[in-house]
Amino acid sequence: MAASARIILPAIWLGLIIGISLIEAPLKFTAPGITIPLGLGIGRLVFGVMNWVELVIAVILLWSLLKSGVDRVYRSVACGLIGVLITKVVVIRPLLNQRTDAVLAGVDEGGSSLHLLYIAADGLLIVGLVAALVMAVRRWVLIRPAVAADDR
């Protein structure tokens, strides 16, 4: 399970970020009839659920790392990913929620650079997840022939 988890979990996590952050979020505001308050409300719901799913993936990934031997570089990348995720959920999201509360209450016009922090965090996650996937797939490809040779 641990070797496959090192490939499957980052792939799912990467797909989640690409699908929601890079595709759904920008497109949502181009749909007919979507107002800023409606888009912000949808965004809070979608990103809240996405962050919970990301946290579950991160916990399972961490568990798989603790359960099996993995090289130090992969472990460092995975821990970095978890650190970025925690920062995104614990620091950036609450600030964005305060900001969207103000916009939804009509107190603020919007236009904050806080979304750029969230985008930057997702950018770091994308780079880290691709790196983790490359390392895991390379290791899997190198180990598989050796295992197959042992079976002969």
Residue ranges and their predicted role:
Residues M1-L14, I60, S64-G83:
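Interfacial segments of alpha-helical transmembrane regions
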Residues P10, A58-V70, V127-I143:
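Transmembrane alpha-helical segments in integral membrane proteins
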Residues I17, S21, L85-I92, I126, ...:
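Alpha-helical transmembrane segments
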Residues T35-L38, L104-A105, A120-A132:
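Short amphipathic alpha-helical segments with coiled-coil-like heptad repeat character
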Residues V49-V56, H115-V130:
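Hydrophobic alpha-helical transmembrane segments
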Residues K67-V107:
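Mid-chain, well-packed structural core segment of small domains
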Residues R144-R152:
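Short, highly charged, low-complexity non-transmembrane loops/tails of multi-pass membrane proteins
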